[in-house]
Every structure is written in structure tokens, then in C-alpha cells.
Amino acid sequence: MDLKYLILMIAFATVEINVTESRQNDKRRWKNDKIYSHYVNICDIQDRGSKVHCYCESIKIKTATKADCWVFNGGIAEDDPFWSNFYSQPKIEKLTFNVRADGGLTYIPAKVIVRLERLQYLNIQYANIYSIPSFAFTNSTTLREITLPKNKIAKLEKMSFAHLIMLSNVSLVENQISELKRDVFYVLPNLQRLYLSKNIISVLHDGCFKHLNNLIKLDLDNNQLTVVIRENFQGLSNLITLDMRNNKLTMIGDLAFAELWSLQELYLDGNEIEFISERGFGGLTQLRKLSLADNKLGTLDDGVLDDIQKLNVLDLRNNNLETLKQEAVQNVLENMKSNYALISLDGNKLTCDCRLSWLHKLRNETKSKRVKASLSRLNCIMDSKTNVGTLKIEKPQKAIQGSYKKEMDYEEEEFEEKHYDDAMQDQETDNDDTKIEYKRKLLEIPTEMLPCPNRLIYEASFSPPTQDEVKYYKTSSSHMLVATTVNLLLSVLAIL
């Protein structure tokens, strides 16, 4: 009997506890609802005169996860009470501000960021934010992506982006940033992508990226950079892709990218590069793609690619190259035979001569369809008025004289009249009307018919003598000296 009574008492006690907890939860919920009821639901603003209107996937209070907000009517002050209304939708994860009026938003709305404890994606565009102050994003522990295009941002203060431990992407494209100072990006352990395209950046301070150890992609294209040095890229040991297209670089100095140990893709298209130092790409042992299209390169010197042992994509389109010697690409030539390789030389004024004969062999040996297609359409220029012969380089026994020149001229004339008339394209005449250039498909000219420049033949003519030739020269000189001495003595005796 006592046991039954005890069990009954426990059951009543349990029910009482549950009822009490339920009342407390209801009271707590009522209290929260009362708190949120003080704020206007930003997803259901009825006031047409409101400075901000937001459109959400749900207008029910405390349920929206996405909000697309528009700033109207001359803008809104940083301390405007309206910002507190974001408490009505505390679950927002993705927030966008579109500014319709010039000057409508001149700051980063930190009071919104701090209220949204689940915010992951922040996008602001068409504002008039001159400067981003220190800690502008309130040390958020949830922000993953910050996108700020077309906001007229000109200045980034020290630690503008700081202590954002989850941040992985930052985009500042199409602003007016002119320089990057040190410590702008600070304690961002997960930042992987930084987009700074279409600004007016002309100065990278030494170490401006030194805290971005995990960055894998950096876009600096369409800026006004005129020079880059090794110190600009300190800390970017894990960077994989660097885009510096359409800047104003004129040369690449020694070890300019040596801090980028993991770099695999380097884009330098659309600059004004005329010279690359022999160690310009030193240290880029992992580089696989190098794009130098639309520059002003007149030559690619031997040794420039020696450190890039894994390179299999080389884009040299639209430069001023007159030739590309095999020695310049010897270190990566085998890579160009792989399935995914590419070498592109279109848009240069390559001369049709024996210095390009190695491209025939590459065309036959490569497995890459892209390489074959690129080389098949490659044009070169045959100049009918220059002293170019069609002979192979040989060591002539005698110096080149006028008779040899006539022979060269004859063979050149025969070549032009009897071969490849159907391949002739785009005849070009110089201003002096004395020189005609013919564009031809390089691979349609057999290697044995590719002419060699006179200077190459000249250099071959005066190659260093062999040991036998040196020995013979010394012996002949000695005999001549003895004979001269004897003749001189006989002449003296005859006089006496």
C-alpha cells in the first residue's frame, strides 16, 4: 500500500513539474514576442515613406533567412533608429543592400551586422562609401563572404577586415582603391579568395598580404600597377592563382614572384611588358600556366623558363616576337607534348626561317589537340627582299663571297616562284614600296625549305677552329717564319 502511494505521489510531482516548465516557456516566449513586437518587421514594411524596404522569402516574423534591401529617399543615417528593426528577423543569413540614390549609404551598417548573429553573406552595391574603417564588420564570427562592388571605396584603413574567423571570400571590385597598405587584412585565417579587380591600384606596400597565409586566389587585374617585386607577395605561400591582367607592367625583374611557392596559374595578359629578366619567374616550381598575351615582348631569352619545370600552358599571343628559339623553351618542351598542353604564338610577326623548324617536330610529337590546332593555324612572314637563303646551316670551307650570294638569291627566287603559291596570304607592302611580305602557314613549309638568316650562316662560317686546324696553323706559321728568316740572311749576304 505504501509503495502504491509513493508511486502516485511521484507521478503527481512529475506532472506538476512539467506544467510549471510549460508555463515558464510560455512566459519566456511571450516575453520574446513582446520584445520583437516593439520593432517593425523589416520584411513587411507598410510605410511607403520608409528609407529602407526589404524583400524576403518569408514575411513572418523571425523566419526570414534572406533579405534583399533597397535604400531610397536620400539615404539613412548611421545612427537612425530604423536599424534596430533588424531584430525582427534575427535568422537572416544572406543580406543585400542596393542603394538607389547617390549618397544614400556612406558607411558599412555595423549596427545591422552586430544584430544578426547568423549572418553569413553580406552584399552592398552602388553606395558611396569613401572609406572602410577599422573593425568595420564588428569581429563577426559568422560572416563567410563580403561583397562590396561599385561603392566608390577609395581608402582601406588598417584592420578594415580583421578578426573575421569564418571569412572565406572578399570582393572589392569596381571601386576607387589606389593603394594597399599593410595590415588592412588581419587575422583572417580562412580567407581563400580576394578580388580587387577594376580599381586604380598603383602601389602595393611591402607585406600588404602577409597575413593571408591561406589565400588561394588573388585578382589584381584591371588596375594601374607599373612594377611588382618579391616583397609585395610576402605571406602568400599557398596562393594558386594570381591574375594581373590589364595593368601597366613594363618589365618583370629577378625573383618578382619568388614568394609564391605554390602558384600554378599566372596571368599577365594585356600589360606593356617588354623585358623579362632571366630569373623573372625564379621560384615558380609549381607553375603550370603562364599567360603573357597582348604585351610588347620582342624576344624570350634563353633561361627565362628554366625554373618552371611543370609548365604546360604558355600563351604568347599578340606580342612583337620575331622568332622563338627552341633553346628558350627547351626546359618545358617535353611538357608541351602532353594531352593538356598548349603553346600559342598567334598574332606575332614571326619570320619564316629555320629557327622555327622545331615547331614542326613538336606538331608531330605532341598528344595535345590544342597544340596541334594552335600550330596548324600559325602564320609566319616571308620577306622577299631581305638576304635570306633557303639553305641549311653548314660550315662552308671558304668565306661567303659574291658567288655564294648569287646562289642564295637564285634559290630564293626559285622557292618563291615554284612553291606554295596557294598558301600565300595577306600581302603586305612597306611604306618604301621596296619590300613585300607574305604571310604563310608555317607548317605548310617543309623544314628543309625553311630559309636561314644570313647572320646564322655567317656565325657558322666563323666557328672556332678544330685542334687539327690550330696545330696546322702553328706548324705553317713556324715554317713561314723560318723561310722568311733564311731569305733575309741570303739577301744580306748578297749585298755584302
Predicted region positions:
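Extracellular leucine-rich repeat
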Residues: 2-496
